[in-house]
Amino acid sequence: MKFIDEASIRVEAGDGGSGCVSFRREKYVPDGGPDGGDGGDGGSVFLQADENYNTLIDYRFERFHMAERGSNGRGRDCTGHGGVDLILKVPVGTRAVDDETQELIGDLTAHGQKLLVAKGGFHGLGNTRFKSSTNRAPRQKTLGTPGEVRSLRLELLLLADVGLLGMPNAGKSTFIRAVSRATPKVADYPFTTLVPNLGVVNPRPGQSFVIADIPGLIEGASDGAGLGIRFLKHLERCRVLLHILDIDPIDGSSPAEAAKAIVAELEKYSPKLAAKPRWLVFNKTDLMLEEDLQERVDAIVAEMDWQGDVYTMSAFNRIGTKELSLKLLDYIASLPPIDDSIDPDSEVEFKWDNYHEANTDSVNEDYNDDFDDDFDDDDYDVEVIYQR
């Protein structure tokens, strides 16, 4: 199945049902009073994370989604039934953004998690609600409010502990094949990897972490060169980044300059992503003599002015990959757990906070119920005239 990590959709919640004007009329009950029921609430639209989904391709072809409208109220105090909620299944790791306001609505990071993206309209009131000691036969009602309408941008961000980044043909896909059972395509030409790949690494029995491989970056990627930087978003949730360098590029280019270009593209995309823990990993060390290897590594590190962790490996021959996997496992285990809980005291102002209150007045502005204040049933009775 084709991997699609972005989709734009339009969601419409159901309108609320209108109230009913009705009166109880039975034999021997001439003054039964009002019995108009309320309308039903409109159905809401939810996103729900499902681990059985791994792409947003369905929403590329089906863009409009509408929940059910609430039914109108009826006589005998019958309340209209509420509209059925619409639940849209999305992959775990999906982020929902309002296309108009660019506000982040929420992230779905766990299987079964639900997110309200469009709230159904409120129900209208029947005339029973307006009965009072001075108004025994009210003839007013209210209409249901419209449901919320949103244009959403869905973004799928892969959930991984370790992210791989580097130039094309640095050996990222070869590394993920060496340490996991993932089988991304490997070839001797640039941009072999066209979509992100995930692999589960098991360095020790019962202990594992997830690693993500994204297409390679080149200088100018932020301006659209190569495959651009659109896949960098899949590294945003990673705990640590592995910056893989070809220690001896076949084209004679400088590994230090290549590394600086990658860092520059990271900073252009997101300073927060560029500030994540990053390890420098030199690959293809089997192509050099052992006595020249350390000297070459030291020279590149000095040219980069690198102060972080440095590792060497040969992903093709699986030399140093096991040790690196164990280091990653221990490092991830030492990090504090990610707190995904939401502060219940935090106040977040969304676009639709006052939506229903604002619409309640507008949808009912045509209803003038002043004539109800002095309404008397006797005014509508049959007039009997006696003559002598």
Swiss-Prot record:
* Entry's Gene Ontology molecular function annotations: GTP binding; GTPase activity; magnesium ion binding
Q: Which Pfam family is one of this chain's hits? A: GTP1_OBG
Binding, Mg(2+): S173, T193
Q: Where is the OBG-type G domain?
A: 160-333
The compartments listed are:
Cytoplasm
Task: Provide GO CC annotations from the record.
Answer: cytoplasm
| Cofactor(s) needed by this chain | Mg(2+)
Q: Where does this protein hold GTP?
A: 166-173, 191-195, 213-216, 283-286, 314-316
Q: What is its EC number?
A: 3.6.5.-
Q: Which Gene3D superfamilies match?
A: GTP1/OBG domain, P-loop containing nucleotide triphosphate hydrolases
Going by the UniProt record, its keywords in alphabetical order are: Cytoplasm, GTP-binding, Hydrolase, Magnesium, Metal-binding, Nucleotide-binding
Q: Which BP terms from GO are recorded?
A: ribosome biogenesis
The keyword Cytoplasm is assigned to this record: yes
Q: Which PROSITE patterns match?
A: G_OBG, GTP1_OBG, OBG
Where in the numbering of this chain does the Obg domain appear? 1-159
UniProt key word Acyltransferase: no
Please give the subunit comment from the record: Monomer.
Identify the NCBIfam families for this entry: Obg_CgtA (TIGR02729), PRK12297.1 (NF008955), PRK12299.1 (NF008956)
What family is this protein classified in? Belongs to the TRAFAC class OBG-HflX-like GTPase superfamily. OBG GTPase family.
Q: Say what the protein does.
A: An essential GTPase which binds GTP, GDP and possibly (p)ppGpp with moderate affinity, with high nucleotide exchange rates and a fairly low GTP hydrolysis rate. Plays a role in control of the cell cycle, stress response, ribosome biogenesis and in those bacteria that undergo differentiation, in morphogenesis control.
Q: Any idea what this protein is called?
A: GTPase Obg
Q: Which organism is it from?
A: Shewanella denitrificans (strain OS217 / ATCC BAA-1090 / DSM 15013)
Q: What is the lineage of its organism?
A: Bacteria, Pseudomonadati, Pseudomonadota, Gammaproteobacteria, Alteromonadales
Gene designation per UniProt: obg
